[in-house]
């Protein structure tokens, strides 16, 4: 028998589609994991189906509640919601594997009684010895030797004090499936032996509980990472048995998403900073930008358009359009896309999103004062077009939230000034001092400085305005100079020119 003839494969479409996201709560959220969540979410929203959120928390040594909370935080930050599952409820509760043991034991009983599971007492040493005696590679693995043990033979093992593992009787046929991403995948008969589903201590293995949960929850489409492709024929073999005993109605469709690669075409490791979702959030990615980039890790809206909204993704997303080729996490491209989305934000929204980054750098207080809020609103338009990451805000804007006597100067910026910097500052101060407070605006400030430095002293703009930029911001790179001077006001601007002039001995 084959997977396509022995038992039905789901034909679910539209609102009948049920996908799942079932992470293990270990470590911090990995961008590859969140990409998987995003693709499942997008497919559910595109079809009108349901997304189930299930927690695979049966590894007591590695699972942690802290990791679970971080995962929830990541999903909420990206606004990836689910229709059924942990934290939401639903008809298939509970949604944590650690709370579903009784369900697994019932399925194990049915599989055993129906003959799909059989007792296996062999030790690793005995398996190797049999392989060696038969002229096979001793590391070849299990040889299905115990499929047909008699009850007397099983009892003899029990009398030795042995406890059996339970193995699935794998069909002696090719196992094929039509991968939604990769097309037809076939594992020839004999590709793998009967495999253990239940440990000798009675504990069910992941290879049992994951497909059983999918079956009991009516999952129709399994969209997951390419690293799990090799386990799919085992799951299909188990599905044959689950359908036989009435636990499942059909085999789900499988789609294996491409690897996310890091630098040097190596799989993006948890040890790589770029793999940590919160690393990107802390640097100043916004949800819209990161969602857009994660979507491009294996999928695209059109061949010539990279910037799109989440709803545009939902409208267009089909897992059949996902490419099987590995996707490389290109940080520069991700940052560029994030900048595109920053520029799409409404100005007041953009300004408020800067606040946590300014607070984290102690640029503003825990509660913005009236003056701080006013300055932020006025300064936001000066930097929105220039930023790729919100985390750039402290470096770009901190000079606007301090005073001349407290402004820090970048040593490299000061040392790079030309010998005529003091003269430029003196001439600028004299010219600006004559501008009435009531007429201190961008046009007049620019006109006065151009007349003094460009026309009067014959300087090129870059050389003329460099000392002024350092004086005003403390840095070589800043928001537009004249606009910054107007925001600071006449007195503060002149005080900053005086301070740098004093540092230069002018």
Swiss-Prot record:
Subcellular location: Cytoplasm
Alphabetized UniProt keyword annotations: Aminoacyl-tRNA synthetase, ATP-binding, Cytoplasm, Ligase, Nucleotide-binding, Protein biosynthesis
Motif 'KMSKS' region per record, residues: 267-271
GO molecular function annotation: ATP binding; glutamate-tRNA ligase activity; tRNA binding; zinc ion binding
The protein's Enzyme Commission number: 6.1.1.17
Transmembrane residue ranges: none
Enzyme class: ligase
Keyword Ribonucleoprotein: no
GO CC, any one term: cytosol
Domain of life: Bacteria
InterPro entries, A to Z: aa-tRNA-synth_I_cd-bd, aa-tRNA-synth_I_codon-bd_sub2, aa_tRNA-synth_I_cd-bd_sf, Glu-tRNA-ligase_bac/mito, Glu-tRNA-synth_I_codon-bd_sub1, Glu/Gln-tRNA-synth, Glu/Gln-tRNA-synth_Ib_cat-dom, Glu_tRNA_lig_a-bdl
SUPFAM superfamilies reported in the protein's UniProt record: An anticodon-binding domain of class I aminoacyl-tRNA synthetases, Nucleotidylyl transferase
Reaction catalysed by this enzyme: tRNA(Glu) + L-glutamate + ATP = L-glutamyl-tRNA(Glu) + AMP + diphosphate
Motif ('HIGH' region): 23-33
Entry keyword annotation includes Hydrolase: no
Residues the record lists as binding ATP: 270
GO biological process: glutamyl-tRNA aminoacylation
Disulfide cysteine pairs (residue numbers): none
Similarity comment: Belongs to the class-I aminoacyl-tRNA synthetase family. Glutamate--tRNA ligase type 1 subfamily.
Subunit structure: Monomer.
Summary of the function given for this chain in its UniProt record: Catalyzes the attachment of glutamate to tRNA(Glu) in a two-step reaction: glutamate is first activated by ATP to form Glu-AMP and then transferred to the acceptor end of tRNA(Glu).
Listed name of the protein: Glutamate--tRNA ligase
Gene behind the chain: gltX
